């Protein structure tokens, strides 16, 4: 067997992830340490095989269904790529063109679209208290449908971003970090600064910063959450980060100083997000149909944002990081000064210097999603990876 693939299989052999089989992937903190760590070697193995022209199709037919309730480029194409890598066709559910627009229930829709579906990926991140709840409702509906004999199989649900977490993004970020620092074992004690940064828009989801502090604190890292006063994230996610840090020997601290967060940081992740309290209020206003209230809130939040234009990832701040060479992360697209906006999250020179690593960071997401699906659909991942290599079907046939 190929030595590199054997290395990935050996990593899996040391982990207990049996509960992932026939499961879903909602929040990273729902998973055990071993379950999270299993995703990484599977993602690496799938990537390695594709790079070496080995087909990784475990399905001869089947659907991967995507539902995006917010705009998406990277995650939309990553989900489609992941499904295709494993042999699934992708069908995007357009709610506006379905019977959902005419009052069809979640239970009915979930079952009607899932007769031949093996996975459902959902992005629902815009309204606090809604996205994760909706994803769970869909998962419960198809589980019951399978139990009742309506569905031949239970589709796996993958969270492509909700109001609480963005696991496919944060796991891709983590795999990028693991490769950058040479292994999971080298992350303990590394300082990561998850910092708010200015954006001319006001309503960016909380799920990325929440996902980052909820995941990175699992690996013994020193996680710093920095933001201006009033830009707090969900308190329950902060509690998750605190508990993780206490368990792993790392730390979780908060500051209202971007400079303090950047000082001696090994990794920086400057990104805008909307205040938790404001997003809660926004959700309630939409529920009440209060158009005037929504406009007033938008005006208030834009003015609040404008008071913090100095929260920008600059060359000067980057010089204060560990040896002036911190790894710069972003989920993309970034608000780049004098490129995508006048004032934004990052100076153009900083972004340009890290452009290639940023694109590589994004490139892990299709494989992370594929690994999540693989672990949910394959009872013996190690044996299946070995069989795929032994089968030796070329992904791209050439004479």
Show the residue positions of the predicted features:
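Positively charged, low-complexity intrinsically disordered leader regions
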Residues: 1-77, 81
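Phosphate/diphosphate ligand-binding glycine-rich loop within oxidoreductases
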Residues: 57-178, 336
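Glycine-rich phosphate/diphosphate-binding loop of Rossmann-like nucleotide-binding domains
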Residues: 69-81, 178-292
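A short helix->loop->beta-strand "cap" motif at the edges of active sites that frequently abuts
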Residues: 148-155, 221, 320-329
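Short, conserved loop/helix-junction motifs that constitute active-site signature segments
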Residues: 186-188, 217, 316-325, 352-353
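Rossmann-like adenosine-cofactor binding region
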Residues: 243-347
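Adenosine-phosphate binding glycine-rich loop
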Residues: 321-399
């Amino acid at each position: 067997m190929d030595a590199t693939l054997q290395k990935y299989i050996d990593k899996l052999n040391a982990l207990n992830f049996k509960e992932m089989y026939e499961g879903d992937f909602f929040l990273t903190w729902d998973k055990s340490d071993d379950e999270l760590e299993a995703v990484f070697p599977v993602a690496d193995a799938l990537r390695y095989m594709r790079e070496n022209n080995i087909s990784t199709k475990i399905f001869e037919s089947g659907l991967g269904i995507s539902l995006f309730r917010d705009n998406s480029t990277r995650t939309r194409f990553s989900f489609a790529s992941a499904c295709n890598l494993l042999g699934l066709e992708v069908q995007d559910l357009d709610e506006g063109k379905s019977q959902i627009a005419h009052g069809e229930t979640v239970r009915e829709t979930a079952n009607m679209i899932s007769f031949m579906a093996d996975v459902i990926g959902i992005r629902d991140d815009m309204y606090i208290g809604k996205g994760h709840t909706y994803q769970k409702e869909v998962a419960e509906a198809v589980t019951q449908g399978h139990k009742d004999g309506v569905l031949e199989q239970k589709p796996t649900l993958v969270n492509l971003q909700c109001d609480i977490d963005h696991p496919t993004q944060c796991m891709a970020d983590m795999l990028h970090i693991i490769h950058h620092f040479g292994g999971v074992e080298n992350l303990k004690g590394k300082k990561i600064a998850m910092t708010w940064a200015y954006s001319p828009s006001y309503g960016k989801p909380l799920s990325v910063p929440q996902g980052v502090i909820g995941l990175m604190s699992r690996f013994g890292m020193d996680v710093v959450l920095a933001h201006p006063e009033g830009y707090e994230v969900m308190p329950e996610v902060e509690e998750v980060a605190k508990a993780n840090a206490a368990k792993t020997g790392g730390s979780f601290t908060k500051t209202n100083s971007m400079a303090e967060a950047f000082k001696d940081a090994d990794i920086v992740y400057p990104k805008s997000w909307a205040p938790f309290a404001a997003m809660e209020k926004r959700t309630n206003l939409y529920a009440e149909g209060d158009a005037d209230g929504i406009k007033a809130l938008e005006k208030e939040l834009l003015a609040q944002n404008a008071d913090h234009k100095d929260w920008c990832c600059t060359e000067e701040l980057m010089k204060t990081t560990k040896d002036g060479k911190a790894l710069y992360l972003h989920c993309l697209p970034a608000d780049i000064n004098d490129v995508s906006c006048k004032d934004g999250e990052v100076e153009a020179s900083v972004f340009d210097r890290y452009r290639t690593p940023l694109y590589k960071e994004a490139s892990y997401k299709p494989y992370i999603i594929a690994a999540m699906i693989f672990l949910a659909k394959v009872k013996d991942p190690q044996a299946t990876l070995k069989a795929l290599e032994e089968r030796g079907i070329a992904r791209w046939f050439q004479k």
